[in-house]
């Protein structure tokens, strides 16, 4: 099968979050499974700076963006068997960052038009075209409404993956003519209109042959008013083509037996290296080096969406326990300030590292006993899977991908891979925290069994790849 991915970011070239991880990992797994895979990404200035000497020029042409003719260069490199093509236009993509400009609508309108017109020119007409989030969600619409006259594109099947429904691409309807060069008919009849705006995500949901999300629970949640971001009715209407597939993690990169960022390696049969990493981490972040105290890790953006309003409200109570917490992350200044204040009040119990450090993050995943992740909503989440890979038990709010990946501790059977609570409130966070602390202190054999189950969980991309192939084969024989 010939599969083409079109996305706004992709590791290792450009990455701001989970979308970049997916584009870096899933195509590689599909190639291993015997498929021909290509990816189209914008050619950002950070790609030029880091990978420019590895990328070759292929061709260039002009793209009509409304009444304008814009330069479009095509560049190319091959990595892990995947051919990466880059859309080059320095005006649109040399901004020092991926997102956040006032003209993001124009930037990604150009990108989508260029990606479609590039397919013939690079001689890669896919059987299946996989687009991601709102930045590329107009492509299924454009294929059916603007480029339907191109015979080579007639049989292309499309899949839209929603990584985060909050970001929908809502713009003025004038963009249809001014940028995409199409009429207003589909806006006037309501197909593309939502809240009196042009909504790119709605267009993708309606025009793609299949819609996927990054976990089965999130696929269900976005059809409810609580999580649907005002598109729940549209998703319910199209529910027959909506499914959820849990993202994977790179099992080779996140491997406690070989991780180059760790001082000591270990496996599920011998956790002595984990204990040494714990002592090393305690020393590094300025906490008393104690093997007996439960060490809780947090690696996250400090935002309300991640549940840190509830954590801050609970923190004074939690820190009355004989416990240590090491936090790494940045975000809302109010939360940054709160954690910094608590770290001053409880210097032997809380280390607040208001920054981001890849090595420290990896040490937290590997060295801690518990990993706190009480997200208000979480489409998939990768941190809980990374933590489990290293025998660090997650304590999570049961939403989205957290519900699908963390098996809550069952005291009757002594089974599970972590701890969870259903109601995001200080009471239930504290109650679940106490359950975990009691198990850690009084039932070490059960705790050790949970660690083993967590480390044996299969979150590899090869497993996720099989689910995506089942989805693709439902469209392409």
Curated annotation (Swiss-Prot):
Enzyme nomenclature, EC number: 2.4.1.21
GO molecular function: alpha-1,4-glucan glucosyltransferase (ADP-glucose donor) activity; alpha-1,4-glucan glucosyltransferase (UDP-glucose donor) activity
Matching HAMAP family: Glycogen_synth
Pathway per the UniProt entry: Glycan biosynthesis; glycogen biosynthesis
CDD domains for this protein: GT5_Glycogen_synthase_DULL1-like
Reactions the enzyme catalyzes: [(1->4)-alpha-D-glucosyl](n) + ADP-alpha-D-glucose = [(1->4)-alpha-D-glucosyl](n+1) + ADP + H(+)
Enzyme kind, highest EC tier: transferase
Entry keyword S-adenosyl-L-methionine: no
Name of the protein described by the UniProt record: Glycogen synthase
Gene: glgA
Family the entry assigns: Belongs to the glycosyltransferase 1 family. Bacterial/plant glycogen synthase subfamily.
Keyword Glycosyltransferase: yes
Annotated positions binding ADP-alpha-D-glucose: 15
Top-level division of the source organism's lineage: Bacteria
